[in-house]
Amino acid sequence: MMNMQNMMKQAQKLQKQMEQKQADLAAMQFTGKSAQELVTATFTGDKQLVSIDFKEAVVDPEDIETLQDMTAQAINAALAQIDEATKKTLGAFAGKLPF
């Protein structure tokens, strides 16, 4: 019975640590950039959009498609950074689970 209690205590401790890491990650900001950094997108670690910024050179009413493509590049780059940080931050817990 003692072994089960120790496992539960360890699991609760790991859960608190993981929740703190998730909160830390959510408080961070990640910025993705398009080619030539003409579009930047900034997200929080919990994938909430903070801002999208456009350089004047990319705003051309005759070429909306380029603006759309660069916006998608910037957003995807930021989201990839978040995914990588999440793997690094929370992936460490996978090997520590007591069961």
UniProtKB/Swiss-Prot annotation:
The keyword DNA-binding applies. Its main location: cytoplasm. The keyword Cytoplasm applies. GO terms for molecular function: DNA binding. GO terms for cellular component: bacterial nucleoid; cytosol. It holds the Pfam family YbaB_DNA_bd. Gene3D superfamilies: Nucleoid-associated protein YbaB-like domain (3.30.1310.10). It is found in: Cytoplasm, Nucleoid. InterPro entries: YbaB-like_sf (IPR036894), YbaB/EbfC (IPR004401). Keywords: Cytoplasm, DNA-binding. Belongs to the YbaB/EbfC family. Homodimer. Binds to DNA and alters its conformation. May be involved in regulation of gene expression, nucleoid organization and DNA protection. This is Nucleoid-associated protein Sez_0297.
